[in-house]
Amino acid sequence: MNETYRGGNKLILGIVLGVITFWLFAQSLVNVVPNLQQSFGADMGTISIAVSLTALFSGMFVVGAGGLADKIGRVKMTNIGLLLSIIGSALIIITNLPALLILGRVIQGVSAACIMPSTLAIMKTYYEGAERQRALSYWSIGSWGGSGICSLFGGAVATTMGWRWIFIFSIIVAVLSMLLIKGTPETKSEVTNTHKFDVAGLIVLVVMLLSLNVVITKGAALGYTSLWFFGLIAIVIVAFFIFLKVEKKVDNPLIDFKLFENKPYTGATISNFLLNGVAGTLIVANTFVQQGLGYTALQAGYLSITYLIMVLLMIRVGEKLLQKMGSKRPMLLGTFIVVIGIALISLVFLPGIFYVISCVVGYLCFGLGLGIYATPSTDTAISNAPLDKVGVASGIYKMASSLGGAFGVAISGAVYAGAVASTSIHTGAMIALWVNVLMGIMAFIAILFAIPNDDKRVKDAK
């Protein structure tokens, strides 16, 4: 590590561009599923798997990639991630073979796993105090803002230029990111780690999470009383206990459970998982207004514009609140406003224009709350991690983001489909949205009990 080097705006821009290769471009496929079906001649199931694989593989590999970044260098790992992003995007656009689409999406997931913890660790190393909080705000703008606009962006590009241009733009952005990061001094963990990579832990984790994903997304199709369903449940449970046993025995665990002895880190990570899980709100609300109210995909996207605007505006506000009052109060405030927003979006029984108003205000609260929450949460997580474990700690934190989003969408979609089939489309949407309200309440409770009231950083600033 270069002791005298301090990061500037050029490095921040390079990192943010790297971050949006996942949050904006890779996630944009959620709104171009019909286009993909037509281009690849594939059924809905195949395309759904391809769309979800990136977030899932990102979540599964992000911790291991964070640990590897600590060992081989975070700048090097970021560049590897950007190169993988280019390869994944190229595989998706060069042919009409579904197998290459799926492979490209898997590679994009591994790319995101390399980029996210490495860039967070670079920011912790080369920025300090208020400058670090500012840098993290822009990182959050890349991730939360990218996820906020990805649906509208994907639909707009696919409609005007063709869906492949999403990934052509992604390749260009990845190259720009590499050029901007070039010249940044390498940073590694100060403690030399001679232990072998936890391959066994990674294999068990992959088996467990893939099985759990199938249980959630395909449970109804398999039949909740079928042998396949119970077999998968058994695999998830057995794999979970094997994973715990393996992680306690190995010298270099994939997930270092000692990090969770730090309550603020635990609270930030759990609440981050749950508040990424409420992304299920978007898929339920968008599907409902199209199926239940006859909106087009573009009209549905317009309803959520207030979400995008507020999340981008409020991230810097969250940073300022963090500096003035510590992390707990803005995290609680943000989460509370998110819950109010989802509750307003869930008022599907309101007539016509009244529901539109409720939805627009709800999305506004949704974005406002997430924007306030983002920077205090991220700063709490990495500030409470030991310097030699910051890559692994960042990896676990971002694993919570990816898996929260992946499973939140999967759970909301499954609840919506099941509830609509057994009741009505309005009741089904309301039930699925209240599942997201419940996740928000659980996040609030995690913050309330795990994040301390006294923040030493605020006292130090005074």
Tell where the protein language model's regions lie, with residue ranges.
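Helix-loop-helix hairpins in multi-pass membrane proteins, especially solute transporters
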Residues: 67-200
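Small-residue-rich segments within alpha-helical transmembrane domains of MFS-like 12-TM solute carriers
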Residues: 23, 27, 93, 109-117, ...
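Extracellular/periplasmic helix-loop-helix junction of adjacent transmembrane segments
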Residues: 32-60, 298-302
